[in-house]
Amino acid sequence: MTRQRAHIHPFLHAASNLEKHLETLFAESNIRHRQALVLDALRAIGASSQQYLAKHFGVSAGTMSSMISRLEALGYVQRERDVSDRRIEIISNTAAGIAALESVEKYWLDGDAMVENILGTEDAEKFFTLADELSKGLGGGRPKPEKRGT
């Protein structure tokens, strides 16, 4: 009886290797690529609660709190209390955070170029489209602005 190999293994291995490559590129900066993703999300959707960000990124509130604390210590985000519910902290990018994000976007473009160099332009486009569909199907994708009470 032959064992059927799962098709997902090469994808998981490739994703892990790509993430390691990005981590190496981001080591030149003072933020990690996942922190840059948070800055990018805040740029796209505007100020959001820490809880909303944790849910979107699929991490615990504690993990998101640690990430936000580090970004805040670097001067890249600021926290403010929600005027409608003082228990909620609203996180937003600072000008320094936007500048930091813009300085590391080249690393994501390097990742895109690496995939394109391996797969070719046409297959890379298909891959990125399929990866986006997969991400959305798994509950990911670009975040939407948070709906909060006023």
Residues covered by each model-derived region:
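Short alpha-helical "packing" element that flanks the helix-turn-helix/winged-helix DNA-binding module
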Residues: 38-39
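Key DNA-contact positions within bacterial/archaeal DNA-binding proteins
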Residues: 62
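Charged, amphipathic alpha-helical coiled-coil/dimerization segments
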Residues: 69-132, 136
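N-terminal leader segment of winged-helix/HTH proteins
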Residues: 1-29, 145
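The alpha-helix within a helix-turn-helix
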Residues: 54
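Short capping segments at the starts of secondary-structure elements
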Residues: 45-49
